Amino acid sequence: MNPPLKFLTEPFLQFPTESSVKVVWFTEFMGDGHAVSFGGNLLETVFTKNIRPIRLREDKYSRVGTQIAEGEVYEKPVFREIWRHEAHLTNLTPGKRISYRVSSIGEDNELISGRTYTLEPAPPPGRPLNILLTSDHQIKPMVAANLQKVKETFKRIDAVFFAGDLVNIPDRASEWFDDNRGNAFFPCLQGRAKYVMKYDGVETTYRGGQIIQTAPIFPCIGNHEVMGRFNTGKSLNEEFNDTIPRHIANDLYGEKSLESLKDKSFNTDTFENIFSLPEDETGKKGYYAVTFGDVRLIVLYVTNMWRYNNT
């Protein structure tokens, strides 16, 4: 008997405009349909665009499932099937917060629905905002506690500006979703963390905060969103540390297409597949600028994987 279906994440919000917002969530199954119900009595429905971030893997350094020590389950990198679902809600009213709920249908027609949350499009100018500026979570010990305190202090958070280094190794799926130490990226920002800290003989479990279910997140690429040469048989840690410039890869391997050059040099594919990024006619750029209320947010792509001791 198959285990019951469940969501891999709660829904989260991205890139609101004055009349729209994107709702995103993840599962470990492709499914037969995924949708967002929203509005009065949840009577309106939008179906999703679905993709599989194909570089997500686990390896001997993962802490996921029953693997609590190095190499207990995974001796080398193993691909993990994870699906991203994105619905674009349009024709929203500025300043009006409405209810929404996500649903997914499995291949056997089993239906699962999430909790009901609220969303709204981008705030109008002149409205006071509470914006969380954060960075460098990287499954660090204090993240869940800090985010729990944020939510206890500010009942309403309007947006999250994330200045890079969201996880430690971007192609390691469990760092985003379900590290068994309880402090993966999404659980901490969605109030589902279970990170235990011990102080003065007392154990306390910190759960992070329910933040990005109702406040859009605007991410930025840091050096920990960049992976190196792909699928080399090395550990994910070694791949992360194996970046080389594209022109060097071209000289070494003679690769002509962008995809093959990325495999032989560096890439930000997992970051770009996990988050919605604004696009122009040539596709995603990794950098962007948006207006959010009275704030003009400019996000650069200036991370440097190659460090020098004199800079």
Each language-model region and where it sits:
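Metal-dependent phosphoester/phosphodiester hydrolase catalytic core
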Residues: 2-311
